[in-house]
């Protein structure tokens, strides 16, 4: 009986982080060269709890993207120029 109670206590004290996500997290603002660039992406993504941030311009869009090392969440924001 004591062994059973120890097992129940060990299981109930475990720390599980469960997150239900309906889609990828949204960045705070649109990433656009000359307006919202690397510094702003880093600031907003890190403020939201992500590990890193980047701003990658493209021919018709720019993306603010980050991936956390622990949960592999991706945060993208696209801006049409």
UniProtKB/Swiss-Prot annotation:
InterPro entries: Defensin-like_dom (IPR056373). Disulfide bonds join 31-55, 41-64. Its main location: secreted. One of its GO terms (biological process) is defense response to fungus. Residues 1-20 form the signal peptide. The keyword ATP-binding does not apply. Keywords: Antimicrobial, Disulfide bond, Fungicide, Plant defense, Secreted, Signal. It is found in: Secreted. Belongs to the DEFL family. This is Putative defensin-like protein 52.
């Amino acid at each position: 009986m004591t062994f059973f109670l120890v097992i129940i206590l060990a299981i109930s004290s475990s720390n599980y982080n469960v997150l239900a996500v309906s889609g990828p997290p949204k960045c705070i603002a649109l990433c656009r060269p000359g307006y919202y660039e690397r510094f702003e992406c880093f600031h907003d993504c890190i403020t939201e709890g992500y590990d890193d941030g980047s701003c990658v311009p493209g021919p018709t869009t720019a993306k603010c993207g980050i991936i956390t090392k622990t949960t592999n969440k991706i945060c993208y924001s696209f801006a049409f120029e």
